[in-house]
Amino acid sequence: MHRRRSRSCREDQKPVMDDQRDLISNNEQLPMLGRRPGAPESKCSRGALYTGFSILVTLLLAGQATTAYFLYQQQGRLDKLTVTSQNLQLENLRMKLPKPPKPVSKMRMATPLLMQALPMGALPQGPMQNATKYGNMTEDHVMHLLQNADPLKVYPPLKGSFPENLRHLKNTMETIDWKVFESWMHHWLLFEMSRHSLEQKPTDAPPKVLTKCQEEVSHIPAVHPGSFRPKCDENGNYLPLQCYGSIGYCWCVFPNGTEVPNTRSRGHHNCSESLELEDPSSGLGVTKQDLGPVPM
């Protein structure tokens, strides 16, 4: 009986134990079931993050490459714009330069009104300059030429030193005109530097001009047997008494070498009296007594 009771008790307890096992197994499986869906979700979020970061980096690199290409393409256009701007500036400077006057026939055909007489009130008022007072210097000729081309052109009075005049011109001229003037001065300086060498060459003294007496003496040697050699004073004029040593004849002459008539003879003469009687301007033997008294 006791065995039967114990067996029945075991059979009654068996379903209870099975239920407990099922509960334990279910409790163990519930956390695992809660964990299984979380693992793939975390993996998907990491993959999406990596993908988004790589796409962002790719877009940044592509943007930088596009910007560099755009700047490279625009560089050529900027160079063309710079060249065009420089050409326009040069053309503007060229238009500012003074132009030569047109022929009268062309001016009549193009603008006939310019040939009509203008009233005096319409002319610009300014300091009038006397265009007839010109010297023989280079600037005088240039001034005369410019006045003929444009009689109404007014030139500032430049009476200071050279640096002061340049400063005055820089302060009074317009910017474009001063730039043109600076360019001209630059080319003029290059021309002067190329024309003159840096080494100062010693300048030779100009040859001394010989008088008639000195020239005759230079052609005759000091020892001159049988030839006439005139005598000159310190100024190069002929001495009043000239002698031919080989034949012994002497005569009187004027300072220019003209012989006084009727003075040739042997021996020495007093040429001062002969020169007073003769007219030194002619040298042809005409005496002052023959000319008569000089009218007062």
From Swiss-Prot:
Compositional bias of kind Basic and acidic residues: 8-22
Complex formation: Homotrimer. In the endoplasmic reticulum (ER) it forms a heterononameric MHC II-Ii complex: 3 MHC class II molecules (heterodimers of an alpha and a beta subunit) bind to the CD74 homotrimer (also known as invariant chain or HLA class II histocompatibility antigen gamma chain). In the endosomal/lysosomal system, the CD74 component undergoes sequential degradation by various proteases, including CTSS and CTSL, leaving a small fragment termed CLIP (class-II-associated invariant chain peptide) attached to the MHC class II molecule (alpha-beta-CLIP complex).
Entry's Gene Ontology molecular function annotations: amyloid-beta binding; CD4 receptor binding; cytokine binding; cytokine receptor activity; identical protein binding; macrophage migration inhibitory factor binding; MHC class II protein binding; MHC class II protein binding, via antigen binding groove
GO cellular component: cell surface; clathrin-coated endocytic vesicle membrane; cytoplasm; endocytic vesicle membrane; ER to Golgi transport vesicle membrane; external side of plasma membrane; extracellular exosome; Golgi membrane
CDD domains linked to this entry: TY
Disease field: A chromosomal aberration involving CD74 is found in a non-small cell lung tumor. Results in the formation of a CD74-ROS1 chimeric protein.
The protein, known as: HLA class II histocompatibility antigen gamma chain
Annotated glycan sites: N130, N136, T203, N256, S281, S282
Residues the record lists as Phosphoserine modifications: S25
Tissue: Detected in urine (at protein level).
Stretches in topological domain Extracellular: 73-296
Modification after translation: O-glycosylated with core 1 or possibly core 8 glycans. Contains chondroitin sulfate.
Region Required for interaction with CTSL, residue ranges: 225-226
Membrane topology, record value: Single-pass type II membrane protein
The Thyroglobulin type-1 domain, residue ranges: 210-271
Organism encoding this protein: Homo sapiens
